[in-house]
């Protein structure tokens, strides 16, 4: 199914889309304590089913504060190197803005990840984002360099990389402010080149291949005094009413 999770990002809304198995044949059961997965080796088939999920909105998060984390930590005590449990713990810490702990669990998940895991793309993008938010720019850039060949068609990857590069410029990493700014610009331009992709390809956040990347580029051009280019970007990739 196409699961569309709703988030709040500052004053705007965001929709993350994921391909998740939620329509099960008779006899198949879920396993796991949180974010359960079907216990089956049967092939997955995409069906035209869209599920809207509001569990990550603030009012829902406040109701279940700490619940998922307690359950996941109990499971982690039994399987400390399990990639999926560490991934889900990373997500929980990230949503609660504890980026240092999120990075610790994402790092273990990356080390233990099995080939062709369905959440590999999301894990990579989230880990990259959290490294940037934790101020670990050099580690983030090293991760991006290692992972880039896999995600050449992912606007989410390049959108997030652009944010890390901008943070590196703000932090004056290695004294190369202009270098990091130009690379951030190139990353967001790459998002527009790729465009929006089908959620079934990797999953990801709507707008990172269009209006969100264009917004970041427009802000950058405005700061540089390139007002005509900024306006052109906003006109070519208008922000939808639902995200403004």
Locate the predicted segments by residue.
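Catalytic-site signature of metal-activated, phosphate-bearing donor transferases
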Residues: 1-104
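Residue at a conserved register position within TPR or TPR-like alpha-solenoid repeats
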Residues: 93, 127, 131, 165-168, ...
């Amino acid at each position: 199914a196409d699961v569309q999770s709703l988030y709040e990002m500052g004053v705007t809304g965001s929709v993350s889309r994921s391909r998740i198995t939620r329509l099960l044949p008779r006899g198949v059961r879920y396993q796991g304590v949180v974010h359960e997965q079907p216990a089956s080796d049967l092939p997955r088939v995409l069906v035209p089913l869209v599920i809207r999920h509001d569990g990550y909105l603030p009012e829902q998060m406040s109701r279940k504060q700490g619940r998922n984390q307690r359950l996941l930590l109990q499971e982690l005590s039994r399987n400390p190197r399990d990639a999926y449990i560490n991934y889900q713990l990373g997500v929980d810490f990230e949503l609660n803005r504890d980026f240092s702990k999120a990075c610790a669990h994402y790092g273990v998940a990356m080390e233990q990840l099995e080939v062709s895991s369905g959440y590999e793309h999301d894990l990579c993008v989230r880990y990259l984002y959290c490294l940037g938010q934790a101020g670990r720019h050099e580690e983030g850039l090293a991760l991006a360099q290692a992972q880039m060949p896999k995600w050449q068609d992912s606007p989410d990857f390049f959108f997030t990389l652009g944010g890390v590069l901008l943070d590196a410029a703000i932090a004056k990493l290695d004294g190369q402010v202009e270098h990091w700014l130009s690379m951030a610009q190139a990353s967001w331009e790459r998002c527009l080149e790729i465009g929006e992709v089908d959620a079934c390809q990797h999953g990801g956040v709507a707008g990172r291949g269009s209006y969100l990347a264009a917004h970041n580029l427009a802000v950058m051009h405005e700061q540089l005094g390139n007002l005509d280019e900024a306006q052109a970007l906003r006109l070519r990739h208008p922000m939808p009413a639902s995200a403004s």
